[in-house]
Amino acid sequence: MIEPVVGYRMLQAIGWPWPGPPADAAWQAMCAVYSQCRPARVIEQHRSGYVVAEAPEVPIKVESLPAWQRRGFPRHERAVVGDWVLLDGRRIVALLPRRTVIKRLAAGEHYRQQLIAANLDTAFIVCGLDGDFNPRRIERYCVLIGSGGVEPVVVLTKVDLCADVGAAVAVLREHSSQALAVVAVDAREAEPVAALYPWLLPGRTVALLGSSGAGKSTLTNTLLGEQRMKVGEVRQRDSRGRHTTTHRALLPLPSGACLIDTPGMRELKFTGEEDLVEEFADIELLATQCRFRDCAHQAEPGCAVRAAIGCGTLDPQRLHHYFKLRGEIVGAADRSTLRRY
């Protein structure tokens, strides 16, 4: 890999994780193979191709690898917003290994993974304190995000529509066994949004995830300090919004961090590669104390999970949701296996 034309400081401004050449062994090996190429980051993805950057506010339209356009090429092996690539002129010639990635199962009957964003440090789960507030859905987001190696942070918006914000925060904490960060803000105002700055330090990359109408575009505009993203109205009957964000885009923030805004997601299907170790650490720990290793936590003797329910230290509904999510993950894994044969 050749020295970036703009220098590493400019690359750092769009999320390059080192002050100089890559310190990761896998990156070093690939950069050695493509020694005459230069690094860039994918900041937009369209059907017609990609837009990358080597510095803030300097977009470059580039050609993708020819293999990515071939029918049947795995979609999850193509570049996505947040990825780092190597360029030869205006052509992508290689995709650098991902440090983290958030993905889901695409809608439809066929098994197909859909990547949301790559090389993230944190994901803000944006949820309005109106009809959009759904602790179980947030729990599902946390599983998807945590399984990709990304830190989840819940950002509650529309605080003016909630009579008891503290109660909503308490409900979320009850539904999570991990030390889940929950921040309630008025997404329209800069002062309360400043509570998010600990996750928006220079060099960090954060994605906004959530339903349409949750306030992602409003929050983006406040963080940018300008009205760049279109904001849509929300239907009162179901608190649903229209898709004002139609594609994923990486935006450098004044704080020095990078923000990836994403369209609203209605479905959160698992790929089969997730685990519940982080989000359901309490149940996973109890399971290690059961008499039998293959305990199904139903009516087996010596079941520590059932004992916890009996003494009131574990909510039966939490166990029910654990079984539900685990069943979905196993089912998706089975579909993935069948697809290979």
Curated annotation (Swiss-Prot):
Example GO biological process: ribosomal small subunit biogenesis
Cell compartments where the protein resides: Cytoplasm
Binding-site list for GTP: T157, K158, V159, D160, G210, S211, S212, G213, A214, G215, K216, S217, T218
Cofactor note: Binds 1 zinc ion per subunit.
Single GO term (MF): rRNA binding
GO cellular component, as recorded: cytoplasm
Keyword set, alphabetical order: Cytoplasm, GTP-binding, Hydrolase, Metal-binding, Nucleotide-binding, Ribosome biogenesis, RNA-binding, rRNA-binding, Zinc
PROSITE patterns to which the protein is assigned, alphabetical: ENGC_GTPASE (PS50936), G_CP (PS51721)
Family: Belongs to the TRAFAC class YlqF/YawG GTPase family. RsgA subfamily.
Entry protein name: Small ribosomal subunit biogenesis GTPase RsgA
Gene name of this polypeptide: rsgA
